[in-house]
Amino acid sequence: MSNTDNIFSAPIDKIGDFTFDARVAEVFPDMIQRSVPGYSNIISAIGMLAERFVKPHSNIYDLGCSLGAATLSMRRHIQQEGCTIFAIDNSEAMVERCKLHVNAYRSDTPVEVIEADIREVEIKDASVVVLNFTLQFLSPDDRYALLEKIHAGLRPGGILILSEKYVFEDESSNELLIDLHHDFKRANGYSELEVSQKRSAIENVMRPDSITVHKQRFEKIGFSSSEVWFQCFNFGSMFAIK
């Protein structure tokens, strides 16, 4: 059972950059459910997409796996033989808790939980790759290289599932969607102080792209098609097919 997220509930004199440390890992399920609109729907549908695209004797990658929600959703849906899921995160605290979550369930599909920098991990013989609210935390210069590596490591017909927070070119629309997201957080019990302090902590480490930028990047890398399959306010998920 997850603890309640109250990390930003008291005034903080000097707000540092947001990190996925032990404190965040402890409350992460509560934090993400109350902060990301449609998160449960995305996790469920990642499993459905995996069921459609996983091929026998292929690899599945969950890059930036946090506590393994997407990994577990995929493992529940995979019916193919000879598949391995590689769940990778660079946070020691997340990896340790992810291992506990994965080991709590039996399955014919093995999962390897690995502490590593996803920019340095080899992607090979993959039918499914997931980046679930991960790419936005990489520096813009690293994003293209990672996506290029994923494309190279995917089998023809393989799928990349990319969930992200978005920015929008139209300034008034962008501001409205930001405001609606903050309303969502308030409706889920976060105070004005928590909303404000979390935004200050995360704005320097999370730099989202527009949907247009994502689609142009996919096309340039060589994916055959891409589309948004889910969106709620300024959060959503896309697929890109090799």
Curated annotation (Swiss-Prot):
Catalytic activity: prephenate + S-adenosyl-L-methionine = carboxy-S-adenosyl-L-methionine + 3-phenylpyruvate + H2O
UniProt-listed Enzyme Commission number(s): 2.1.3.-
Pfam families: Methyltransf_25 (PF13649)
Signal peptide residue numbers: none
S-adenosyl-L-methionine as UniProt keyword: yes
Subunit: Homodimer.
Family: Belongs to the class I-like SAM-binding methyltransferase superfamily. Cx-SAM synthase family.
Record-given protein name: Carboxy-S-adenosyl-L-methionine synthase
Species for this entry: Vibrio atlanticus (strain LGP32) (Vibrio splendidus (strain Mel32))
